Amino acid sequence: MEFARINDNDLCAISVVSFPIGTAFSVPISNLSRILSAIRETYVIAGTLGQIHFQMMNNSAHICAFTYQSGPSIVKQTFRYGILQLKIISKLFSSRKYSGIVIFFMEFPPFLPMIAAKMLNNKVYWLLPSKISLLSKDMSSKLTAVLSKICYNICSKIILYSPSLVSYWNLEPYRHKILIAHEHFLDFETFTVTTPLSDRPPLIGYIGRLSSEKGVQHFARALPAILSDRENLCVLIGGNGQLRDSIAASLQEEGIAARVDLTGWISHEELPKYLNQLRLLVLPSYTEGLPNIMIEAMACGTPVLATPVGAVPDVIVDGKTGFIMEDNSPECIAENVMQVLEHPDLERVAETGRRFVEENFMFERAVERWKEVLDEI
């Protein structure tokens, strides 16, 4: 694609760079591009894992996407990842006349593209959506940590979802260059209450990636205790990921597979329908940034039970806007799920949470905050 030249007198344009991204990340990057393009000319340069539909993208954001296929071996994977970075660097060079700000929106350090963006005299920002790498201690994670430190020093600013993430992600040495902003907003005509909580079936669930950092394996292990206590209760587990087969096998072994619906991937369009069926959404994550599914559930009047990780405590105040559990052990999950389902003011908590999200996650508020961030640049 060819970028359209903006007038010399105009404010510099913004390039958003993200790679490699999967289907689940299409909403966050689409939201960010929509916010930024309401402020300035915006270009999205993305490396995608397969064909990705960028949802909710308005027409004023320009998209350039490179498809990235993970290799069958470490060597091929590294080679293909290197080629992807070279393609992104090439696009940064070709668009250098039109962009003065580059925002890298990704967890893993964009080492080479960030150096290239800096060499082109761009103001470089790193918006961190999560820090899954903190959970691993293998060699690749150690390399990621080293490259991350280099990128923290290279970039002009680091953008986080919450001040609490500074210490949680061990970023105290860079506090002087940290700004707070997020890309979260909702369409409240889509994410709304269509079925009152009292009219919903006895159904609890988890919706998200089926991977170890999400703690979904512990939720599955908690289900025998939960279901034995409530004979009419059923469970929904929505999403795909590397743990899908092992979770399905464990449900069969425990003899509860008939009461658990493993739906697979749930599209963003179908999500409100599923959320309006749940009496409780459980998020037993080890680590989070600011999970979209949390605010989407709350907007639909669905109570959320979550671990106090990332920016979750900024949104969920235990017993007021939702519920917090101490950890994600199966025993803790089971105990808290049963307590929440028996909570005498569950509908009031759900309504308070819904109002909080409606007041704090409007598109207009997100745009205003990003205007403030860009004014600091």
Q: What feature does the model see in each segment?
A:
Residues 1-53:
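N-terminal subdomain of nucleotide-sugar transferases
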Residues 26-34, 202, 206-225, 242-248, ...:
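A conserved mid-protein helix/loop that constitutes part of the nucleotide-sugar donor-binding site
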Residues 332, 339, 345-360, 366-372:
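A short, well-ordered alpha-helix in the C-terminal region of glycosyltransferases
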